[in-house]
UniProtKB/Swiss-Prot annotation:
Residues 130-152 are annotated as: Disordered. InterPro entries: Bud13, CWC26_splicing_factor. Pfam families: Bud13. It comes from Schizosaccharomyces pombe (strain 972 / ATCC 24843) (Fission yeast). This is Pre-mRNA-splicing factor cwf26.
Amino acid sequence: MHSAHMSNADYIAKKYLRKDQGKKKKKKEKDFVEIQDEDVAGWDDDNSFSLVNRELTSLHDAPTIVANESLKDRDIDAIYQNIEKTTNKPAQLWKAVGNDEVVESEQQDSHDAESIPQFGLLTGKQVTFKAEERRKREEKSSNLDEEELRKSRETVYRDATGRRIDLVLARKEAKRKLKEKEEEARRQKEQQQGVVQVRQQKEYLKELERQKTVPLARYEDDPEYNKELKERSRWNDPAASFLTNKPVSSKATYQGYAPPNRFNIRPGHRWDGIIRGNGFENKWFQRQNERKAQEHEAHMWAIEDM
């Protein structure tokens, strides 16, 4: 009944209009992680990188102040030191994989001289130094290019098994084999020659050595030359039949002991010392000795009575 006599205004005020009770609701706890530092990549962990980051940021944000003084009045060395102190360029920290040593940048080495800022006019020493550095870099790069080009053009030779062949060693081996082949051919040629040809060749070489000491002028009455011509044997010499002072050519004979024979002929120098006869020479000498002994005994008996 009471609710039936309630006006519409009271009903709306009761259901929808509420007074502020002064109580605040508790904030719902955050279920996410809030990043307090903007350094997501972790650059601030390393002192060197964080220092560089802050300095570069400060340099970028700082206003550029240009003094009224002229660059000519300022010392170049002082400017360089100022720039090094402000920039504080970090050391190269790139490392090769698997190595603890720091690998320096090739670009930094090659362009180190050009990276130095130049202000105003350059002195003669600075221009000379810069030109010399550029010339050294160009020579170094050209030498590297020539070496790489030579290696790329070098032909690789391989044998049937696929093994690489060194041309220098192969040429040396070929020269050695050719020399051995020539030596063998010369030795075979000497063996094929006769004894007379070998002796004549040796005599010719000996004569050449002797001619080095003789005087240059030789005349027809030279006694040594005449003696040499007289001792030379000729096949059509008419006096060869009645000459008595013909020199006897000595032949190489055996120098050791050799058994005697009827004709008193010495064995040659190639004899090996083995007697291959049937013993006839020994029997012949034995018979001759017996005959001489009998004759001597008969003679002694004949004169015994005298």
